[in-house]
Amino acid sequence: MSKITSSTLLKFKQEGKKFTALTAYDASFASAFDSEGVDVLLVGDSMGMVLQGHDDTLPVSVEDIAYHTRCVRRGIKRSLLISDMPFMSYATPEQAMRNATALMQAGANMVKVEGGHWLLETVTMLTERGIPVCAHLGLTPQSVHVFGGFKVQGRDADNAQRILDEAKALEAAGAQLLVVECIPAALAQTISEALTIPVIGIGAGAGTDGQILVMHDVLGISSGYIPRFSKNYLKQTGEIREAIRAYIDEVEKGVFPGSDHTFS
């Protein structure tokens, strides 16, 4: 199989082919996901909750992400590897440049940042210096305390328009991918149709170009709160690789996410 690049994902979008993404944190799981055909792997700051046992993602450090990026890189041959920029690691463009460089040197193909208009200068600076950027809008977990919890975003007209405007601005600033999380399905589809770059959804309906889930949710091994938008594929298959194949199949056929995993 050919390596997945941002150009591959753009081609998928242009052809109307849905693609899949999962979080990964070590070489063994990454190798399994890669060999089964998951297109994008994310070393997510979700590790703060699913690996480290915290209540949110805020305690995760750049060093944590870099370590797990190196682990995942050793396990993959095909998938595009994105690494999260953790909380307060990109508060200024200069800080973002330093920390993004560390993650790229650890093996990432792209870095992901959460935020809207305030990030435009940073996105442009990174991309102009050879660091591809994936933006993230909607429910941005690093802002959980600003939102007052993990809540659906963009339900009212003003916030929906703001998210759409920010998506367009981030694309213009140079972002090559966009993740939208926990927003109404109709808004996510509008954003996907308005942008040239691929849009990946999580809790955002089936109208996006790709889907991403946390691996612990897909395999039913998350402790504590289980998000409504997640689905335990291991429960219905009984084997990890079969679970991953089922996830890929349902995304490509438009079966997942269904109404049970979507917000209005």
Swiss-Prot record:
A Pfam family that the UniProt record links to this protein: Pantoate_transf
Cofactor note text: Binds 1 Mg(2+) ion per subunit.
Single GO term (MF): magnesium ion binding
Subcellular location: Cytoplasm
Protein name as catalogued: 3-methyl-2-oxobutanoate hydroxymethyltransferase
Cofactor dependency: Mg(2+)
Main enzyme class: transferase
A GO biological-process term: pantothenate biosynthetic process
Function of the protein: Catalyzes the reversible reaction in which hydroxymethyl group from 5,10-methylenetetrahydrofolate is transferred onto alpha-ketoisovalerate to form ketopantoate.
Residues of the active site: 181
Pathway(s) per entry: Cofactor biosynthesis; (R)-pantothenate biosynthesis; (R)-pantoate from 3-methyl-2-oxobutanoate: step 1/2
Positions that bind 3-methyl-2-oxobutanoate: 45-46, 84, 112
EC number: 2.1.2.11
Cell inner membrane recorded as keyword: no
Keywords of this entry: Cytoplasm, Magnesium, Metal-binding, Pantothenate biosynthesis, Transferase
Quaternary structure annotation from Swiss-Prot or TrEMBL: Homodecamer; pentamer of dimers.
